């Protein structure tokens, strides 16, 4: 028989840098999960990613206080900022442009995000990422 699910916990944790401090500690402590066990497992699983890259994770906590977790791809905004080499997006994206990004870079980001995005084809996903880029104040070049 399947284990009874007690809770789902959604967090964004820096890849390879999970530790018991907030936000991880309080969120998992409330559910009675062994925090250090999660931190070790998460850091081992995100070893291949760039250290410090914010990584969304969904933790399923069971009634017997055991857990499983699924890591997702980093948010599109983070990948766009990294590709464009900027610190933050524009406060006024229609007026102040903060950087440029090429269509090839958008396609690479769409391919990275493909597993987590809903879309029929890579072109639709690229257009979605392009919209995010524009809303951040990035100029898309062909």
From Swiss-Prot:
Mind telling me which SUPFAM superfamilies this protein's record contains?
Ribosomal L11/L12e N-terminal domain, Ribosomal protein L11, C-terminal domain
What are the protein's UniProt keywords?
Methylation, Ribonucleoprotein, Ribosomal protein, RNA-binding, rRNA-binding
Cellular component GO terms held in the UniProt record: cytosolic large ribosomal subunit
Q: Which GO terms describe its biological process?
A: translation
The superkingdom of the source organism is: Bacteria
> What is a single Pfam family found in this protein's UniProt entry?
Ribosomal_L11_N
Per UniProt, what is one GO molecular function of this protein? structural constituent of ribosome
User: InterPro entries this protein is in?
Assistant: Ribosomal_uL11, Ribosomal_uL11_bac-typ, Ribosomal_uL11_C, Ribosomal_uL11_C_sf, Ribosomal_uL11_CS, Ribosomal_uL11_N, Ribosomal_uL11_N_sf
The record's account of how the chain is modified after translation: One or more lysine residues are methylated.
Q: Which Gene3D superfamilies match?
A: Ribosomal protein L11, C-terminal domain, Ribosomal protein L11/L12, N-terminal domain
Family, according to the entry, reads as follows:
Belongs to the universal ribosomal protein uL11 family.
Quote the function comment for this protein.
Forms part of the ribosomal stalk which helps the ribosome interact with GTP-bound translation factors.
Q: How does it assemble?
A: Part of the ribosomal stalk of the 50S ribosomal subunit. Interacts with L10 and the large rRNA to form the base of the stalk. L10 forms an elongated spine to which L12 dimers bind in a sequential fashion forming a multimeric L10(L12)X complex.
Q: Can you name this protein?
A: Large ribosomal subunit protein uL11
Tell me what organism the protein belongs to: Enterobacter sp. (strain 638)
Identify the gene encoding this protein. Answer: rplK
